[in-house]
Amino acid sequence: MRGLFVTGTDTGVGKTEVSCALLRAARAAGLDAVGMKPAQSGHVPGEPSDAERLREASDCVEPLEAICPYTFAAPLAPAAAARLEGREVSLARVVEVARALAARHAAVVVEGAGGLLVPLTARETHADLAAALGLPVLVVARAGLGTVNHTALTVEALERRGLAVAGIVLNRTGPEDDPSVPLNPAEIARLTHREPIALLPWEPDIARRARSLGSILGAKIQF
């Protein structure tokens, strides 16, 4: 399977935004890439869901169930949200859906929920899913204070499991910077021996930010 698995160091770090930018950049370069969200939870009615945003960025006509096989109401990790609804997430089912997408498209960008060790099923985490799919993992992290520890821990967890690290992206998710922001890329590189691919700029205009992220990431990430 050709593609990327996108994980985060936390929730709210911009995984969907980065995944959509990668998809748009890939399609602009002529690559038929499609997004996938194995499970989404806590969708706010009236707002586009992560799966809908990924499908739009993929510019495809896939049904939402083919993009996201599991949707839950509660804003919890997939395994916990499933328990509340008396349901179960099946790793085998998620892998089956991903492989079906891969058979119809040239590449798949799989966006996980939360971080790498967030429980996907009653027994497996998103790290297990990344391993089952055999995809390199792109780590999306916040740019500010605390990100050095979170990012280093995520990279260490990936390496201990023998999972390929596609890169690290530091994402500014708001206009405010703290004094650590310009220093964090070098600290992360020193601790992980991996130079972050990009420190993404903040841009309040959504359309302009999408174009900016696509341009930056498209030039630096190949899959």
UniProtKB/Swiss-Prot annotation:
Where is the signal peptide, in residue numbers? none
Enumerate the residues binding Mg(2+): 16, 50, 111
Q: Which GO terms describe its biological process?
A: biotin biosynthetic process
Q: Which reaction does it catalyse?
A: (7R,8S)-7,8-diammoniononanoate + CO2 + ATP = (4R,5S)-dethiobiotin + ADP + phosphate + 3 H(+)
Sites binding ATP sit at 50, 111-114, 171-172
Domain of life of the organism in this record? Answer: Bacteria
Q: Which Pfam families match?
A: AAA_26
Q: What cellular component GO annotations does this protein have? A: cytosol
Q: What is its EC number?
A: 6.3.3.3
User: Annotated pathway, please?
Assistant: Cofactor biosynthesis; biotin biosynthesis; biotin from 7,8-diaminononanoate: step 1/2
Q: Does the keyword Cytoplasm apply?
A: yes
What assembly does the database describe for this protein? Homodimer.
User: What role is this protein assigned?
Assistant: Catalyzes a mechanistically unusual reaction, the ATP-dependent insertion of CO2 between the N7 and N8 nitrogen atoms of 7,8-diaminopelargonic acid (DAPA, also called 7,8-diammoniononanoate) to form a ureido ring.
The record's similarity note reads: Belongs to the dethiobiotin synthetase family.
* Stated name of the protein: ATP-dependent dethiobiotin synthetase BioD
Q: Which organism is it from?
A: Anaeromyxobacter sp. (strain K)
